[in-house]
Amino acid sequence: MTRASLEKQPHEVASMFDGVAANYDLTNDVISLGQARLWRRAVAAAVDARPAQKILDLAAGTATSSQPFVKAGAYVVPCDFSLGMLKVGKERHPWMPFTAGDGMRLPFKDETFDTVTISFGLRNIQDTEVALRELYRVTKPGGRVVICEFSQPTWTPFRTVYTEYLMRAIPPAARAVSSNPDAYVYLAESIRDWPDQPALAALLQKAGWSKVAWRNLTGGVVALHRATRA
């Protein structure tokens, strides 16, 4: 059984992320060859946070992804199902309203947020369609969703090289810098098995979102999907 074939049981995935929380941001920088910071900047530009907006940052981990929204003056709620991640985040940013929550049963009222966003976490939720509907539920009419997730490179020769990198280079790199390298083997397998850009767009539409669009980053290694709640 591969780690990605755990059927993404929440307790299994949460336990993996608990184990990597302390060095999570450093490890991401290493295995992404520094691209993770560029991707976060692209998310911040897409969210375009404004003062007094309410933003849900789902799968926020240690809330590194939340900081650009905070600096823009928005009220940001970092939410994650890994208590280990939340603990590290709270130590770093004690003023933030860290919230434990499952993406399939968000602990928020209907139509709470102006924008909802999730970066590199949608793959880890057991039922993607349920999660997209939950994000829709807690978004105000006219509000937006921004999803940053690993995807499929658009150039076939590069896709082949990228797949080799996922399965052969990430595990040893993770062993060098992570306290739980098995979590990054799971990461590689879950990326390989994840739907491509059009497939995720179709799931967004099925969940009720409108004006669905995406932009490829790093040649499609990552895709930034955007949509609006009518």
Curated annotation (Swiss-Prot):
EC number(s) stated in the UniProt entry for this protein: 2.1.1.163
Q: Which reaction does it catalyse?
A: a 2-demethylmenaquinol + S-adenosyl-L-methionine = a menaquinol + S-adenosyl-L-homocysteine + H(+)
Tell me the GO molecular function terms. demethylmenaquinone methyltransferase activity
Q: In which pathway does it act?
A: Quinol/quinone metabolism; menaquinone biosynthesis; menaquinol from 1,4-dihydroxy-2-naphthoate: step 2/2
**Superkingdom of this protein's organism:** Bacteria
One family from Pfam that matches here is: Ubie_methyltran
KW Methyltransferase (keyword) present = yes
What keywords were assigned to this record? Menaquinone biosynthesis, Methyltransferase, S-adenosyl-L-methionine, Transferase
> What PROSITE patterns would the database entry show?
SAM_MT_UBIE (PS51608), UBIE_2 (PS01184)
- List residues binding S-adenosyl-L-methionine: T62, D80, D102, G103, S119
Coiled-coil annotated spans:
none
State any GO BP term from the record: menaquinone biosynthetic process
NCBIfam families assigned to the protein according to its UniProt record, in alphabetical order: MenG_MenH_UbiE, PRK00216.1-2
Recorded hits in HAMAP family, A to Z, give: MenG_UbiE_methyltr (MF_01813)
The record's family statement is: Belongs to the class I-like SAM-binding methyltransferase superfamily. MenG/UbiE family.
The entry's function note states: Methyltransferase required for the conversion of demethylmenaquinol (DMKH2) to menaquinol (MKH2).
State what protein this is by name.
Demethylmenaquinone methyltransferase
Which organism's genome codes for this protein? Streptomyces griseus subsp. griseus (strain JCM 4626 / CBS 651.72 / NBRC 13350 / KCC S-0626 / ISP 5235)
Gene symbol here is menG
